[in-house]
Amino acid sequence: MPDSGIPTRQRRWIAIFALIALGGLIGASGIIASTEINRATSSDAFCTSCHTMATVAANPQFQKSRHRTNTVGVLAGCSDCHIPTDNWFIETYTHLVSGIRDVIAEKTGNFSNPAVWNARRIELAKISRDIMRRNHGVTCRKCHEVSAIRAPVGAHAPLAQGQMTCVDCHSVHAQPAAASKQ
């Protein structure tokens, strides 16, 4: 290699700086790309583009639920309840894991058939509730603030103290009563 006239030590620092700059550029590009992917895959249109979720979204109990029809006009979308957005890494991880899980479920089960979906509805509702319990109601609290609950006493006192989650009492997806008690 011909000598460029730049001392070896200086070349080494230039190479290190170039690698750090390249790593930063790749990292920033990855964050920007994943943020855009998160945004694009968070719409109700995207979520219901597969047969399974179209069946769930069309369910009359869900369409009549408070998250779809309420007095203040707020319409909760799929990602409002299913994707925690308080942390970019957790949001991206949740999109990735739930996306893979949903694609596998779509390809291995015939949930677009309402009879098949109804036969497994309680089981699927329990899985959804368990996920929401594990995330300690973080998605519920995007819209419902514990501090806004008038006098968090009685039933809401354990919630305010972090001893229970919203879905321990409140059903989601207008779930059947059997799923609410599990």
Regions found by a protein language model. Name each.
Residues 2-182:
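Short sequence/structural segments immediately N-terminal
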